[in-house]
Amino acid sequence: MIIPEKFKVAGFEVTVDLVDKTDDNNYGYWDDVNNTIVIAKNISMKNGELTPLSDRQIKNTFYHELYHAFQFYSGREYSEVECNIFANFMLEFDETKKVKV
């Protein structure tokens, strides 16, 4: 899967930023003020060492934050559990789909 740089949700442009690491050391976050999904490429361990995230972790984080954008634009409350579930569903779909052209 290729992580998009930009796309639209509910007519609003959303930007995706891949960063070395987030300020709060999360895997990523949805910024509803700036319509931005921020995804970390690395996580800082307790000893301060940076550990790279796998492609699978980055994809899962993208889907998780995308669902937060869906929740925001549909007027629903944010739910970490719901976002985790749908991110895992989408990752499984993405990894197992067979394409017909």
Regions found by a protein language model. Give the residues of each.
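Active-site scaffold of zinc-dependent metalloenzymes
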Residues: 5-56, 69-73, 79-81, 88-89
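C-terminal charged interaction modules
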Residues: 77-101
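Glycine-rich loops and low-complexity Gly/Arg-rich segments
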Residues: 39-43, 63, 96
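Short alpha-helical catalytic segment bearing the HExxH-like zincin motif
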Residues: 57-65
